[in-house]
């Protein structure tokens, strides 16, 4: 069958077609086609079941946004000398790849196929620079990570509403001693919550059979997630994440008044009124 790039091109070159429907925005449980057990969910979403962005997210962004952008993939943690297929998702007219400050060449960008390189792995930083009309307009980079040393918690919400069963999403990652995210980490992360109840955990792994209602989760691609529902009367919701041989982390989200006593659901830094 056609690739997504082919499909987008066939729509884009036909001005009488008003748009297209992307299936799917998110991965979901079931329908692991064409994969079989142990897969228990789809793998063709542009975001996984936790809402973590896949590389396909940036391909879509390159197709649909006018703002200059460039995304480099994959990560930069491989065996020394291994040939790595380096690709870019960009809406720029040219892209230049650098390894540890040395240019590996500038390429013209085809709108649909974009550009790629084959690079022998060498520890350090891989940087991609995007150009439009010969001017640098954006860049992206990935660096080699050492062993994970510290947990990082990033609340997806700035606040939580009191007295309305509001919930907070906490995203978990790990970094090395230099502060570089470790994309290959799969540590088991354990959670405790103060001022709320843990109602779900996840990591976006379509092959994971771990319980979603639990107080721990392995990292997948260096990430996992915990969702906490605020307890009645709690002033804050605090989550602590721990793991063997890693420095623990704690994050707190403050409660704000919900004067109308409405019920909200929370998604991606937004609070949507339910009733």
Residue spans of the language-model regions?
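Short, hydrophobic beta-strand segments
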Residues: 116-121, 212-232
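N-terminal amphipathic/hydrophobic targeting modules at extreme N-termini
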Residues: 263-264, 270-274
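Extended substrate-binding grooves/exosites of carbohydrate-active enzymes
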Residues: 1-109, 114-136
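Short, solvent-exposed loop/linker segments at the N-terminal edge
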Residues: 77-82, 160-168
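Short flexible loop/turn segments that cap and initiate beta-strands
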Residues: 91-93, 98-104, 140-141, 167, ...
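Extracellular Ig-like/FN3 beta-sandwich strand-entry sites
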Residues: 121-125, 167, 234-236
């Amino acid at each position: 069958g056609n690739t997504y790039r082919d499909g987008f091109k066939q729509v884009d070159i036909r001005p009488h077609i008003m748009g297209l429907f992307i299936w799917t925005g998110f991965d979901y449980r079931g329908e692991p086609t064409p994969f079989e057990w142990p897969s228990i969910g789809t793998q063709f979403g542009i975001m996984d079941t936790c809402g973590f962005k896949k590389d396909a997210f940036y391909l879509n962004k390159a197709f649909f946004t006018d703002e200059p952008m460039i995304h480099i993939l994959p990560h930069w943690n491989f065996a020394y000398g291994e040939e790595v297929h380096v690709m870019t998702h960009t809406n720029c007219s040219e892209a230049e790849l650098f390894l540890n400050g040395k240019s590996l060449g500038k390429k013209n960008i085809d709108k649909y196929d974009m550009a790629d390189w084959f690079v022998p792995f060498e520890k350090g930083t891989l940087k991609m620079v995007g150009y439009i009309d010969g001017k640098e307009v954006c860049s992206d980079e990935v660096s080699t990570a050492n062993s994970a040393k510290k947990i990082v918690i990033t609340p997806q919400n700035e606040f939580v509403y009191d007295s309305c069963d509001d919930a907070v999403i906490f995203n978990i990652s790990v970094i090395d001693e230099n502060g570089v995210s470790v994309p290959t980490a799969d540590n088991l992360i354990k959670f405790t919550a103060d001022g709320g109840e843990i109602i779900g955990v996840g990591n976006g792994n379509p092959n994971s059979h771990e319980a979603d209602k639990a107080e721990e989760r392995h990292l997948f691609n260096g990430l996992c997630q915990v969702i906490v529902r605020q307890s009645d009367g709690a002033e804050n919701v605090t989550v602590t994440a721990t793991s063997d041989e890693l420095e623990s982390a704690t994050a707190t989200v403050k409660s704000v008044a919900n004067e109308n006593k409405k019920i909200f659901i929370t998604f991606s830094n937004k609070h949507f009124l339910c009733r």
